[in-house]
């Protein structure tokens, strides 16, 4: 929270009371409502929220179907002012596989693959799901990552990446 110049600190117990009262899904509308309430509860001109957290999603290997959990880094940053201004940033970081197009073009026997990180940040006007941003990140790569792969899966992932150099 922002503090008036005459204040030396904030009312920390109000934060804990406020957080204990908020047991809601993490959605833009609930975040905005919570920040609007917090700016008044804390008697502040401006409040900020800055969160980074992992989200674990189930992934099935492409051939064997073996299931595993894969982690993605999610970001939520928001600001709300007493006069109603707000700014929100939602983002994800997803690890993917990329096959080098140049390497594929100049090589007769294959191409090199790399693990890459795709970062997406948006300032949404309405609710956006982290899973949708993760899907966009994975589709922008040669291949998504899988937590568990057997030989048949490895072959599939390698060939898929080779057919989709990015």
Each predicted region: which residue ranges?
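N-terminal intrinsically disordered, cationic/polar leader segments
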Residues: 1-166
């Amino acid at each position: 929270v922002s503090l008036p110049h005459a204040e030396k600190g904030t009312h920390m117990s109000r934060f804990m009371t406020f957080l204990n009262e908020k047991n809601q899904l993490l959605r833009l509308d609930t975040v905005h409502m919570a920040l609007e309430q917090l700016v008044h509860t804390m008697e502040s001109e401006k409040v900020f929220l800055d969160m980074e957290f992992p989200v674990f999603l189930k992934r099935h290997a492409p051939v064997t179907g073996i299931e595993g959990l894969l982690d993605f880094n999610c970001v939520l940053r928001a600001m709300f002012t007493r006069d109603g201004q707000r700014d929100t940033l939602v983002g994800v970081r997803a690890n993917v596989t990329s096959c080098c197009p140049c390497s594929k073009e100049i090589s007769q026997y294959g191409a090199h693959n790399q693990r890459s990180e795709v970062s997406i940040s948006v300032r949404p006007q309405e609710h956006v799901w982290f899973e949708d941003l993760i899907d966009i990140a994975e589709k922008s790569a040669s291949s998504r990552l899988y937590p568990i792969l057997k030989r048949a899966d490895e072959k599939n992932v390698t060939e898929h990446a080779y057919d989709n150099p990015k």
